[in-house]
A protein has these predicted regions:
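Short, charged amphipathic recognition helices of the HTH superfamily
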Residues: 15-29
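Single, function-defining residue in the core of a domain
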Residues: 1-16, 34, 40, 44-47, ...
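Glycine/small-residue-rich loop that forms an oxyanion/phosphate-binding "nest" at active or ligand-binding sites
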Residues: 66
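Conserved mixed alpha/beta core segments that line enzyme active sites in large multi-domain catalysts
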Residues: 100-103
Length: 406
């Protein structure tokens, strides 16, 4: 199977049996021709998964370098989010050897991948993704991704939001030294004395690098940076979570106060949760964990190709929403948005016809048909909707509100 067919078949992957996957693809691309499962998988094993990393990064670079693109920002900054997620994979001796065991001692083996992503929360694009073992060093992965993000976004200003448990003292120091703007939620035990001493909701705090704070890093690669100074400064912002002002979170940041007053930090940090939604889309809507096979190379191909399709879907949905911005915001009771599930479903079903079409004019016509159909399917965005969280398996196997896209 040629490389282009191999690539297109993975983009077109629907998570059904491999025989039916190949039958469907070959009927569209090469009617009357068949390929065996072993022959197809043999070709797949020769393809480096990094090819799909290059593919989605190429798309991202074009997206951010487009002079006509209207990028969503907050006070002129792209809002990036860094976080990790567990990806369930088939448990075999090979996957255990490559990725490790995620289960506790003396329990059944369970192979997992730790996926670390850097995400543009406002433009809904996955900028970078790294496959790791479970329980990986998320901050180290995030730092590497932040260091290379300029290759994708160019010289555009950005800030990074991170959850509690992400940055420690060395990471804070490196980001401050490199002039990387960040917002990180603190645990109650992080800089506990400084948190308890806060007299206002927005203060500049001097963090003293005492012996007890340094000892954890002695003899490690972080020793030099924690010994390079006696103190450093953080801005701590208290964000109240309810009207009674009984619950709050403390955020650590180095953002300038004149551009980001304390009042905007609730909304700013809330944007980080869009990365959790992006992970849900990958796993639920795009069925990322419904793998082609059990070999590590196949798993990584499926993960990276799914990220590529996700970014394409968001690019199209965002383009439609910008084109119809006034109509979607003003002509309905609620602000309207493109139905992401339907967008993904249409792309999974129809994108293959565009990829296989050799005539550029027909390609354009086919894409316009998909574009027009997606633009007609919009759903309301209802603000401040909250549902009580119930733990446990209360629903049936098939959700009535989250139907499959394809």
């Amino acid at each position: 199977m040629p490389l282009d067919d191999l690539t297109f078949s993975m983009i077109n992957r629907k998570g059904i049996s491999l025989k039916l996957e190949l039958r469907g693809y070959m009927n569209i691309s090469h009617p009357g021709t068949q390929i065996s499962n072993p022959g197809y998988l043999k070709q797949r094993m020769k393809l480096n998964p990094e090819a799909f990393v290059d593919l989605y990064q190429f798309h991202n670079r074009n997206f951010y370098s487009d002079p006509d693109a209207e990028l969503y920002t907050m006070n002129g900054f792209l809002v990036l989010a860094a976080d990790g997620s567990d990806v369930n994979i088939p448990t075999t001796p090979e996957t255990i050897a490559v990725y490790g065991n995620a289960s506790r001692n003396n329990t059944k083996l369970c192979a997992q991948i730790g996926l670390g992503c850097l995400y543009d929360a406002l433009n809904r694009m996955i900028l970078d993704a790294a496959i790791n073992k479970p329980k990986f060093n998320e901050m180290a992965v995030a730092e590497a991704q932040i260091a290379s993000v300029r290759e994708t976004i160019g010289d555009k200003p950005f800030l990074v939001t991170m959850d509690r448990g992400y940055p420690g003292i060395p990471a804070f120091l490196r980001m401050i030294d490199s002039q990387t703007y960040f917002v990180a939620r603190l645990k109650s035990c992080d800089f506990k004395a400084e948190q308890q001493a806060l007299a206002a909701d927005d203060e500049d705090v001097s963090i003293q690098l005492t012996k007890s704070r340094r000892k954890h890093y002695m003899g490690t690669a972080d020793e030099a940076i924690v010994m390079s100074r006696d103190s450093f400064h953080l801005r701590m912002v208290r964000v109240w979570l309810n009207e009674d002002r009984t619950e709050y979170e403390i955020l650590a940041t180095n953002l300038p106060r004149d551009q980001f007053p304390a009042e905007c930090f609730g909304e700013l940090y809330h944007l980080r949760w869009r990365l959790e939604t992006a992970y849900q889309v990958l796993k639920d809507r795009l069925q990322m964990e419904n793998f082609t096979g059990t070999k590590p190379v196949l798993l990584e191909q499926d993960i990276y190709s799914t990220i590529y399709v996700s970014n394409i879907a968001e690019d199209i949905a965002r383009d439609i929403e910008q084109e119809q911005a006034d109509h979607l915001r003003n002509d309905y009771k609620h602000r309207m948005a493109v139905n992401r599930s339907l967008c993904i479903g249409l792309l999974k079903n129809d994108l293959i016809y565009i990829l296989l079409e050799k005539d550029r004019q027909k390609q354009t016509e086919l894409f316009q048909q998909i574009y027009d159909e997606i633009s007609k399917n919009i759903v309301p965005v209802r603000p401040d909707r909250h549902y009580k969280r119930t733990k446990g398996q209360l629903a049936s196997k098939y959700s009535n509100t989250h139907k499959r896209c394809y």
